[in-house]
């Protein structure tokens, strides 16, 4: 079952759990209402019972979050 997480701190706590082994980072290029392009980054973490997703529209926050992921977590970039 999939769940969407909106809080970054809660997402980082999920990545430190023992049952979480892999994370997927997907970067999409989208347009805002004014037609200006921006990067949307999706972080997907697979737990034992659920797939947790965090969506971030700020590229700076996304880079910091990628760096703060635990080193034991296997990260796939799409």
Swiss-Prot record:
Superkingdom classification of source: Eukaryota
Keywords recorded for this protein, A-Z: Cytoplasm, Ribonucleoprotein, Ribosomal protein
Location(s), subcellular: Cytoplasm
Single GO BP term: protein-RNA complex assembly
GO CC aspect terms: cytoplasm; cytosol; cytosolic large ribosomal subunit
InterPro entries reported in the protein's UniProt record: Ribosomal_eL38 (IPR002675), Ribosomal_eL38_sf (IPR038464)
Pfam families: Ribosomal_L38e
A GO molecular-function annotation: structural constituent of ribosome
Keyword Ribosomal protein among record annotations: yes
Family as reported in the entry's similarity comment: Belongs to the eukaryotic ribosomal protein eL38 family.
Function: Component of the ribosome, a large ribonucleoprotein complex responsible for the synthesis of proteins in the cell. The small ribosomal subunit (SSU) binds messenger RNAs (mRNAs) and translates the encoded message by selecting cognate aminoacyl-transfer RNA (tRNA) molecules. The large subunit (LSU) contains the ribosomal catalytic site termed the peptidyl transferase center (PTC), which catalyzes the formation of peptide bonds, thereby polymerizing the amino acids delivered by tRNAs into a polypeptide chain.
Subunit structure: Component of the large ribosomal subunit (LSU). Mature yeast ribosomes consist of a small (40S) and a large (60S) subunit. The 40S small subunit contains 1 molecule of ribosomal RNA (18S rRNA) and 33 different proteins (encoded by 57 genes). The large 60S subunit contains 3 rRNA molecules (25S, 5.8S and 5S rRNA) and 46 different proteins (encoded by 81 genes).
Further information: Present with 50200 molecules/cell in log phase SD medium.
Name of the protein in its database record: Large ribosomal subunit protein eL38
Name of the gene encoding the protein in the UniProt record: RPL38
């Amino acid at each position: 079952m999939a769940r969407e997480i909106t809080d970054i701190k809660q997402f980082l706590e999920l990545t430190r759990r023992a049952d979480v082994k892999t994370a997927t980072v997907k970067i999409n290029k989208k347009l805002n209402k004014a037609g200006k392009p921006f990067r949307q980054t999706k972080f997907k973490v697979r737990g034992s019972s659920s797939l947790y997703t965090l969506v971030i529209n700020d590229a700076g926050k996304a880079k910091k979050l990628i760096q703060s992921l635990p080193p034991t977590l296997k990260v796939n970039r799409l």
